[in-house]
Amino acid sequence: MASFFQSFRSSSMAKQLLRFALSRLDLLDTQALDLENLDFALGRNTVLEFRDVGLILQKLERLLGLPPAFSLQKAKVLILRVTIPMDFYASPITAEIDGVDIRLKVASKKEKDRQDAGKRGKGMAGSEAVPTAADLAQSFLETQPVAEKEELEQALAAETQDLAASMAASEPESDDDSPVGTGQPLSLPVFLTNFLHGIVDRIQIRVQSVTFQADVEVAVDSNSPVPEPVTFQLSLDNINVEGVTSTSETPDEASTIVHKEGKRHVLLDNIRAALITETNVLSSLARSASMPSSSASRSPVAPRSPVDNETTAFNPSGLSRSVGSSAMAGSRDSSDDLPQSQHLQDNEAAFNIPYDFGDSNEPNEADEASPLSTPRASLYRGSPPPTITDHAKSAVLEPSPLIWSTAEREAQSVPFLRPPEGFPLSNDPSPAASVHSSSTNRSSGSSARDDLAESHIYSHEDAESMYMSAFSQTGSQGLRTGMPGAWDAFDDAEESETEAGPSTSTQAAPYDGSFDPPQPDRIPSPEQPSQDQKRNSPSFYAQDSSAEVPEPPQDDIPTPRGPTRLVKQLLSLSSISIYLPSSHKHVKIDTPDDGKSISPNIPGAFSMHSAAATSPKPTPADEPAGETTPIDPSIEIVLKPVEIQFDASIGFLLAMVVAQLLEAAQGGSKDAAGPTAAKPPSASPDVKVTVEQLSVLFLEKLAGVADVPQRFFEKSTPDLSSDVLLQAQVVDLRGSVSHDGPQTEMDFSIEKLKFGYANDDIVSFDRSVLMFESVANTFPSAGQDISVKATMGPEISRLEVNTLPLYVQLDLQKLDEVFGWFGGLSSFLNMGTSITANTSRADKSPANPVQKPKGVRFDEPVHPDDQAVTRENKTDLRINGLQVDVLGKDCSVMLNTSAFKLVSREGGIGIHLSRIRLSGPYFKNSRAEPPIVSEVLDTRVEFLPSPRAKDLERLLELITPSSNKFDEDEDEIMVDTLLRQRRKGSVLSLAIGKVRFDAGNLPQLTCLPSLIDDLAKLGTVAKYLPEDDRPGLLTLCHVKNAECRVDFGGRFGAILTSLTDLEVAHISMPQLAAVALGEIAVTRNKIEELVVTSPPPQTGPWQNLPVFRLRLIDDMEPVLKIKLMGLGLEYRVPTIMDLLNLGQDVTPEDYEAGLAASVASLGEQAHTVIKRASSGSLTSTGQAKAPRSLKVDVAFRDCLIGLNPLALPSKLTVALTDAHLEMVPGPQELVAVTTMKRVSVLLIDDISILESPGVRFTTSRRPPVVISTQVAELCTMGYVNICQISSAKATVTVSRDSQGDTQLEVEVRDDLLVLETCADSTQTLITLANALTPPTPPSTEIKYRTTVFPVEDLLASIRAETFGRAEGEYDLDNDFDVPQELGDDADSDLDFDAGPSDSPLNLDSQYLEENIVQEELFDATSSSMLREGATKFEDTNDGVLLSTAGLDNPSSSGLEISSSDLSITDDYFDKGPVGRGTAHRWDSKTDRYDQHNEIKLQRSPLKLCVRDVHVIWHLFDGYDWERTREVIAKAVKEVEAKAYERRAKTDRRGGFDPEFGEDEPIIGDCLFNSIYIGIPSNRDPKELAQAINHGLHDFGDTESIATSTVTTSTLRAAGQRRRSKSLRLDRSRRHKITFELKGVSADVVMFPPGSGETVNSLDIRLRDVDVFDHVPESTWKKFATYDLDAGERELGADMVHAEIITTKPADTPATEMVISATILPLRLHVDQDALDFITRFFTFRDETAPIHASPSDVPFIQRIVVNSIPIQLDFKPKRVDYAGLRSGKTTEFMNFMILEGARLVLRRVILYGVSGFDRLGDQLNDIWTVDVKRNQLPGVLAGLAPVRSLVNAGSGFRDLIEIPIREYRKDGRIVRSLRKGATAFAKTTGTEVVKLGAKLAIGTQNVLQGAEGLLVPQTGESSSNAAAVAAVLGDDWDEAEYEEEINRKFSLYADQPLGIVQGVRGAYASLARDLSVARDAIIAVPAEIMESEGAQGAAAAVLKKAPTIILRPAIGATKAIGQTLLGATNSLDPMHRKRVDAKYKKH
């Protein structure tokens, strides 16, 4: 092969091959290089040097594939030196480059729009790839002559044959490993290809001073139309490319460049990146407010120090490689004759530079080197290449001596700095060291692309001429036209720049006009640059970023002096080492040798091998012979310490620059996608990356240097440690990418990762913080924080990340200090948002929407072979624990978790945490247990890009449940639209197994608000998250179980809350939230239940439904819907007392005041929360809209409210079957409206029955209406349904008055309230109501005022205006209320206006004349009722008194009253009822009503108004409680036993014993103060039960108690007991008495504190009161009603009006009541059975459960006034208690008389000092009974039934006399007077006569019917009817009920005809019916006689029908007469029909 190389060497092909290769590169300017004249000689070392070589920009753009927005402005190489050794086939070719400058400009959007789109498109169409060695070889051979190619081919063929022969001859026989084969001959193209491969692999490249600049225009301020220029600069000091086959020559070099066998080492040294921009740009981005003074005093430019005195030498080291000693000697000899260039010194005056570059007194000045001015190549033979040293590295912010640099001469921004041209490039101090030949000067052309910036005013020519005139010197051979600090000129044809030689920085000295070159002895060794020089060298230089169009010359404006641009370094990288493997195998050849093969491994030469070397080369010691180290084919990249530093302004500016670069790059991505996709896939090499250390520093202020020449000479010494705000550090990052066929594997590991402050960490990894150990924990390898492993294949892609436990420490105070420099985190983020918004607003223009073509469009189906779609991506992340410490100013909170596992699949992302623990707060220097500990177990999080079907089902079930809607009439949500939106959105599903929360020691939580406020500042980051046009994220959360325990300490104790199945759904946009809760339970101290979930009904559609639902949808009128179902709330007095922190000695008034205040405060807080929610979350973002009011709608379904009294076993439960609560917040008030459609009130006497086992309560008594299944189940548990409410409405208004006090106004309306109780349940209800407040503690002090205030000055109260005109009538007794004779009676509890019977004024008005002064208190018909207004009584406006004044005394209507005595109220009808702004107040000292204060009333804290409530109260006979029935049954059993015992004693005596005669005491007992059980001696004990049943009249009860089976220990109903008629004590089937109250209105006004002694005022008004009699044996209908005979009622007058004022006199500790009551005239129809039932009902008392728990709770009535009550009474007795008569009970005489229309008046009474309402009733009964007996017996006796008609007829005769006299006195007309009297007499007398006839006829009919009933025997008709009914009803049949129905009686006076015509028709019909019955009886007699067997049978048949035949016609006749007369009565007196309808039952 040696002969072939000799042939190849002797030919010109090698030289032509090099020229061809250079020309085909097509990057260098071949015209400047003049490759045709390039010549070199083989066999000798040749040095080729090129200066100012430009790169072809278009070619470079095509190779780089730049987008259209990127344009290369300049790309030039200052010096290119190529050294070709003589043995280039074995030795490397060295390329040395000095000064690479590339400038890139990014066009703005406007400029890009103006560009020619076709220009770049044409250039890109012809893009070419870099040619390979094979391409070059083949193309080269095509251009060579055929003769030369044939000659070389022959030589190559011959060499191949000789090589094969030698290989065969020298092959040893025993060598089995020698390569053998039949190879093919080596062809010339293959040889040339391998030859080029070897040259390329051995080539070595040294590059110095590389600068890359990108100019970008950024719109910083939206108000400025001109964008600001910003330059991004990237600088590299050195780039060393090592040959693949090269080895280290010296130990020093080996330490710098680490060689790896088979790999090319590329070293990039000292890489720096910076931003250069105007100063105002950075100032506009920096904050303008809240900057500390220390920062304000700092300059944006880094501080500088004076120039160092020490002269630093310039160290060229890049081209210091020697190619041979002979070549070096030759170069030295041939360089002596080269001319030297002259030194050129810049003028300091032109730049105002106050320093010098050198010292003129320095001895041994070096000769000046010739300028590097020619662009032509120079040929050097045998000379060493001149070396170019490294320019000293510089860190702008580090203290270092700044020296001259050669790295960036052409890379500086305007103004830039060049060293003087006299500086030599060589490090040889001798003039002979320069081997450069002088030639032509540098090109003077310049490009217009480097124009002036806008701030410059001179053109280049003007500035250059001024510069040349200032620095004119002669003798310089290479005078440069560019001036230091200025810009170079370019033209379109050529780009040329001046070079900068090496320079030194010398000591500052006065300038003497000369410049001294550096001393030779001060130049350090080029091979050993000091570390200080590397670390302290200048980093980068400013770059001009002027506009393209230069400004016109302006000669009259002076040159600006101040620099306006700043340079700030962002990145500093020590070095990057890249090891590139070679794809070509090499054999090292030292010298040509015929005995050795040159290329045994050339492709195609399979049988060639190297022969044994004759003289083998010694093998190094570390590489044993015969061993070959395998070559790693991977690419290795090693990054030495990397440091990135920035501040806020630089960060925002860099973000805008990067954003604009990305936007510009995206513009060309589509164009580049086509050619790139067309390239065939190539095998990717393996890559290994190592980063020793990476530091990212966020500084408070990044110091910079001004873009002026001084920055290269001065020192900057800022202190970086104090400026670091945040930093991130990564230590030893290692990564590798390997390929195994189609599969790619990547491994990454990080030894240490930290993020935090300068001296503390925020985020770090530490194994010691792991709290929850688990066998499943898998940690990374030892010494690693993070390990990442990724595998990518055609079918699956997997990523596995494993880390140590993560430790996060958030010091909120430090964070606030860090971001406090920017005004806080919000201000910092707002600043960034505003900047980016301004930039996007300024850069972006509205894009025209693309109009889609019309028609049907189909989505392209996914191809099954598409790997990108079918590949399965899997990601597994495991963080083996997490600890987060949140540190506040006073306390801290800690969060610990178990291993954090994240799994990502194609379907979504899943996260699992088995345990999470949150605890705190922790206090500094305290080891106490944290007060709050919360744990979350089994947390699973799933994130899906699109929802699943079950997710949508869960969402719909939460917002629109199908089985249980929020509202029956709710508007349907557009489900289709919602589902369509949700299918486009993502889903976040959160499932939590269990949550435990425990809080105690609550006083320590006072520090949490400040900690939460600090965290809220960080929470503002959420609003800066990017928004998406897609529908908002759907979040679904499910918590299976949750427990919360809060220990409040003290008396209140701990609250435990348990939740089950909590589900939450939330959508961010459009806003939607829904919550569902399965069960909830809240207990206090584990014994008191506060909130419970009632068990679901066993049957029905509402099983297993959530107890709580919530839904909120953002709408035009948003409504927060809440639905509570089956929720139970418990009210307990001890809980409220402990919650309000009330003592045991609290009074009921204080308790009620505290409870009302807490309710008002709760309403106020709810108002605040709702307003915040409506104004915050529901306002649209980005638009200023008025906050919409959020309406809250709460629905209650089967909810329970339990009222538990204090120290009682009873309980009241309110069942809200269907209720609604709506809250609407207003601007100043909160309005809540509660609507109750179906509500039940249930009562139980002992709650232990609910918990005791046993059979449920069953009863056959069917309720009239089944309210709900829940109520029915509660009744089976032992409850009694006592009340039903329907259509009730309550409105609550919470507001604030002008003084800021809270006001609560409540208005209640109810259409129907039905109350159903028995005697015992009524007393239990009253007792329970009194026990809902704490009892009044006992006190020894005087509670009530019992003495009269003494009159200190009687005359002081007398006023002159009181004694006016002495007109009118005066009643002295009424004016002076307290008679003297009563004042001395201390034991009297009552005070009459006139005394009792011993008073001399006790006279009856009917026995006195009219002119005598009448007694007002006892005369309801007195005219004094009209004078009450004139005498200024408190009841002046009572219409009741006015309407009944002339009832019995018509003459009183003619009373003359002076007009002066009238009190006229103009606005009487405009005033509302009491409570709507007015209320009475009481003054105890004056014993009168005080004048009300309107202002104080308007400030009332509580106003309760009840309007138009309809109340129906059904009184049932029997008893509800099992205990009551058992007590009665036990007493009956005991009495019966005593009776039997007495009878047994009597029988043993053998006869009648006088001792046991009739006078013997009756054995008996009185139970519950209402039931008397007694057995007379002459009665059988067996009759006792029957007597009790008859007394109870319980015909409707079906259950009974057998006395023989009753036990005292049974509290539970033992199922359905056997039927027994012994006792029937359960509640009756039907009610006996009904109270119907219509138009119930009440007003409660609480007066503010300090307004007087009046605490509150209660005003009750009943519009209509009716008491119905439902006793089966009674024929009367209404027990009590309004008396129609009293006349028409005043419009709006109330039948009952009571005013109760609660006062608290100053000298008494308790409250007292002042009562005033007025009742309209009453009409009473009293049946004795109904009266006995009412008496027994209301006198029931259970001594074991007193009504008042404390004697102090008995209300004290200070004063009560009961106005006169006129009564008209009908009484029907049925039984006489003779035993009572014998015992002296005279009231039994009333039972002998039937009263009809008896009139009496319950006189006006005033009582003082009455304790309790029971005593009040007794005293009123005693007073009125005595008064009626003594004064009103004539009126009562006139109502006796036999004489009533006579009395009424007598009144007609009286009218015949009185009316004419009265009329004659009035007008004197006799005839008219007589006519009126006769008319009144005829009407009264005639009507009474007709009534009397009707009574006689009906009485006769009644007697005849009774006789018929006695004479005609009853057949089996009734029993047969009962059997028929039982057959039909089956189990529902009840004998007692049927007995009740058949025994129900109706009066013959009921259902009267309306008039005489109807009466006649009814008489005819009844007579015809009775005659028909008699006829049928007559017809039936013969048949019965014939059927009889004898005369006796015939007589019996006749006797049987005789009563009917005889009596029926008489009955018909009397009935006809009665009906006719009744019709006539109703015609004469129309009011009579109304009276009858109110009195008698019809059905």
From Swiss-Prot:
Q: Where is the composition biased (Polar residues)?
A: 308-325, 470-479, 528-546
- GO cellular component terms listed in the entry, alphabetical order: endoplasmic reticulum membrane; phagophore; phagophore assembly site membrane
Which residues lie in Acidic residues bias regions? Answer: 1370-1392
Q: Which GO terms describe its biological process?
A: autophagosome assembly; autophagy of mitochondrion; glycophagy; lipid transport; piecemeal microautophagy of the nucleus; protein transport; reticulophagy
Protein name (record): Autophagy-related protein 2
Where along the chain is composition biased (Low complexity)? Answer: 288-306, 434-447
Membrane topology type: Peripheral membrane protein
**Region described as Disordered:** 111-130, 288-341, 353-392, 413-458, 469-488, 493-563, 839-863, 1370-1400
